[in-house]
From Swiss-Prot:
This is Keratin-associated protein 7-1. PANTHER family: KERATIN-ASSOCIATED PROTEIN 7-1. GO terms for cellular component: intermediate filament. Residues 43-84 are annotated as: 11 X 2 AA repeats of G-[YCGS]. Pfam families: KRTAP7. Belongs to the KRTAP type 7 family. Signal peptide: none annotated. The gene is KRTAP7-1. It comes from Homo sapiens. Expressed in the upper portion of the hair cortex.
Amino acid sequence: MTRYFCCGSYFPGYPIYGTNFHGTFRATPLNCVVPLGSPLNYGCGCNGYSSLGYSFGGSNINNLGGCYGGSFYRPWGSGSGFGYSTY
């Protein structure tokens, strides 16, 4: 399992998925690995996901809505988020 943390628009063409991990993570480039607190957050709040419940499994308390507005989306899929790849 490859740990990764994505911030900003590494693959901005993707919508904000709220689906299962396999479908989302397989669309995630494995080179998208940046440290917490990276300046590449683009205002999407890449700090403290783990403290907000954005651990593996996601959470429905993500009021950022994937940084594009809305609600009840998992933070990854749009380029920001924290999780573990199945690769």
